[in-house]
UniProtKB/Swiss-Prot annotation:
Chain segments annotated as coiled-coil in the UniProt record: none
Family: Belongs to the dethiobiotin synthetase family.
EC number: 6.3.3.3
Gene name for this UniProt entry: bioD
Quaternary data: Homodimer.
Root EC class: ligase
Protein known as: ATP-dependent dethiobiotin synthetase BioD
Gene3D superfamilies given in the database record: P-loop containing nucleotide triphosphate hydrolases
Length: 229
């Protein structure tokens, strides 16, 4: 089993589209069982999108759902509940036992709280997952990545690689000015797997698979290998 946590520098950084692109590529080329696990979702969006894109071709797991689009402990408290970390772990173990690939989509960034004293970074460390960090390609992305990679190392995470995501259309000139790959790799001491281009048809599985293909080719043998799972 290969498992990986896809985290972002913030809410709306491109985690969901990246997970979908990687899953679409996997289903098209590996043809072995895969799952996307969204441990906690607050408000509608991600799981519904995945189910629209993949239907029955992919297991979409969401053990905890809360109505309010807030940080998980606050959303849970509104419903008189708490975030059961043990339930999340059980769901991951069950997914790992039955799938060749489990993409775990984080909530917000690595510092996002899952409980009152537990963050996404704690989950990544406790579950011993390699982390793929995605950041939106815009002005300021270099500083965001430097800050987040520093935080990840301070938390003793297995931060393995970076991805840039065009959440909006970006020109070649803007890409070069805002996100110089050599500069990012020098400062973060991590490989940039590539740029996930903006997709006009984000529910098109073929387009998603094509977008994920370059990232998978770069990641092969380093991030998503059964030995690391």
């Amino acid at each position: 089993m290969a498992g990986v946590l896809v985290s972002g520098t913030d809410t709306g950084a491109g985690k969901t589209i990246l997970c979908a692109a990687l899953a679409a590529w996997w289903l098209a080329h590996r043809r072995t069982p895969a799952a996307i696990l969204k441990p906690v979702q607050c408000g509608p969006g991600d799981r519904e999108y995945y189910r629209t894109v993949f239907g029955d071709a992919l297991s979409v797991l969401n053990p905890l759902y809360f109505e309010a689009p807030l940080a998980p402990p606050l959303a849970a408290a509104r419903e008189g509940q708490t975030v059961d970390i043990g339930l999340l772990w059980k769901s991951y173990c069950e997914a790992a036992a039955g799938h060749a690939l489990v993409l775990v989509e984080g909530v917000g960034g690595l510092g996002c709280p899952l409980g009152w004293d537990y963050t996404v970074a704690d989950l990544a460390r406790d579950w011993r997952l390699p982390v793929l960090l995605v950041a939106p390609l815009r002005l300021g992305v270099v500083g965001q990545l430097v800050a987040h990679t520093g935080f990840a190392r301070a938390q003793n995470l297995d931060l393995s690689a970076l991805v840039l995501s065009e959440i909006e259309p970006v020109s070649a000139e803007q890409r070069a000015q805002w996100a110089d790959v050599q500069l990012i790799e020098n400062l973060c001491h991590l490989p940039v797997l590539g740029v996930l281009s903006h997709l006009e048809a984000a529910t098109d599985r073929a387009a998603l698979a094509a977008a994920g293909s370059g990232l998978w080719l770069e990641a092969a043998g380093t991030l998503f290998t059964a030995e690391r799972g």
